[in-house]
Design a protein with these regions (language model features):
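Short C-terminal tail/terminal secondary-structure segment
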Residues: 80-81, 92-108
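Conserved SDR Rossmann-fold cofactor-binding beta-strand/turn motif
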Residues: 20-30, 84, 97-99
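Short, small/polar-rich loop/turn modules that mediate ligand/substrate recognition or access, typified
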Residues: 15, 20, 91-93
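Short-chain dehydrogenase/reductase
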Residues: 7-8, 77-80, 84
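Short, flexible catalytic-loop segment of classical short-chain dehydrogenase/reductase
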Residues: 25-36, 40, 44-45
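Conserved catalytic helix of short-chain dehydrogenase/reductases
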Residues: 1-13, 23
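C-terminal beta-strand-loop-alpha-helix "lid" module of Rossmann-like NAD(P)-dependent dehydrogenases
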Residues: 40, 44-58
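A conserved structural motif in NAD(P)-dependent oxidoreductases
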Residues: 48-51, 62-76, 87
Length: 108
């Protein structure tokens, strides 16, 4: 929450100088550590890492999202590249969810 407040405060303070400030809130994201974590859980559960991930992102799982898969770190990178580009000048002071559609609440 404090990072969100800092984002909004900075956006207010530096916007007049043409600087944008945003906060990316990623969901469960595949990184270089993901395989190790999935393997550990698979060993505990007695199934394969692929089965662990399939269960995690199956409909009805508390870990799933609307696209039923883990977000890849490159997808967060694409969003970051857009926000750093001149094409995103109108986006500032925002918390941008990039989790594949987690949750059903509307925040505005």
């Amino acid at each position: 929450v404090s990072l969100v407040h800092m984002t909004k405060t900075l956006a207010t303070q530096v916007g007049k100088f043409g600087i944008t400030v945003n906060c990316i809130h990623p969901g469960t994201t595949r990184t270089e550590r993901t395989a190790v974590m999935l393997e550990a859980r698979a060993k505990e559960m007695g199934i394969t890492p692929q089965e662990v991930e399939a269960q995690d992102f199956a409909d009805g799982s508390p870990r799933t999202n609307h696209i039923n898969r883990m977000i890849d770190a490159s997808e967060i990178g694409y969003l970051t590249a857009y926000l750093a580009s001149d094409k995103s000048w109108a986006v500032t002071g925002e918390v941008i969810m990039a989790g594949g559609g987690t949750g059903n609440a509307v925040y505005y």
